[in-house]
Amino acid sequence: KNHYTHIEMMPLSEHPFDGSWGYQNTGFFAPTARYGTPDELKKFVDECHQAGIGVIMDFVPVHFAVDYYGLKEFDGTCLYEYPNAAVGESEWGSCNFMHSRGEVRCFLQSAANYWLSEFHFDGIRMDAVSRLIYWQGDEARGVNGTTLDFLKVMNQGLKSLHPTAMLIAEDSTNFPGVTKPVDQGGLGFDYKWDLGFMHDTLEYFQSAPEYRSRDYHKLTFSMMYYYNERFLLEYCHDEVVHGKATILQKMNGEYEDKFPQARAMYLYMMAHPGKKLNFMGNEFGQLREWDESREQDWLLLDYPIHEAFANYRRTLNELY
């Protein structure tokens, strides 16, 4: 009905804290019980495939939850994490994987393969790849050669076992070759999120129309680098939480003024080269920020202005 080709699921591995949205895992081989049994997850993916919809899953190869019933100090010692807290603790308060250990690399490679093999996901989006390219994502600390090698080996291995699977990097750096094949010196991903496009376009449409003539570069700058990689354009979950406001609410002006601007922004996105990704709720003009503890405000579809916006987004998807 809405003409989507794929669904991307936020992490489905078991995790203790709802507020982590699944990005702080304890069970890398265990689907979370929040949504049912493993067999029910397989059935969901199968029914999506029967409807012509692919399913992509978020995978977290950077860090894991600090809960002691997970991987932390698994046998009383630091098996999976760094013993040095200065490098072992992530910015989210979780434990960084120690990728220099072969056993840790094999564990993560096996986990990624498990989701593709057992549940027939059509792709994996790897979270926080910038934290693997540079030491804890800090370019000033230099490239992390060990984790780059880990990414190359994992991507090559997954492609050899699942040639049609999409491998997507969430990466905010300018590191070259993220989407080039490994045998050509790249990291072996198929696509990379274009976070710069998202931030630039949102800033443009947040500004008052009378000042936008000085900000045209925010619409055009992406074409300066676009063909260096294979990009995926996204308006994602990170932009509709923690006081940032929803996509619709970011638009300049009063309530009624926001809709035509959001329509223009999405039309520009659809006309721009690259794959498209849109977080749930954006398609009908969600007004409240996303909160993992409640569902989206579907009642907004009873309002003509939101229904018309949803129909417009549906038409754009059909055109795409």
Kindly label every feature range from the protein language model.
Residues 76-78, 91-93, 225, 290, ...:
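Bulky hydrophobic/aromatic packing residues
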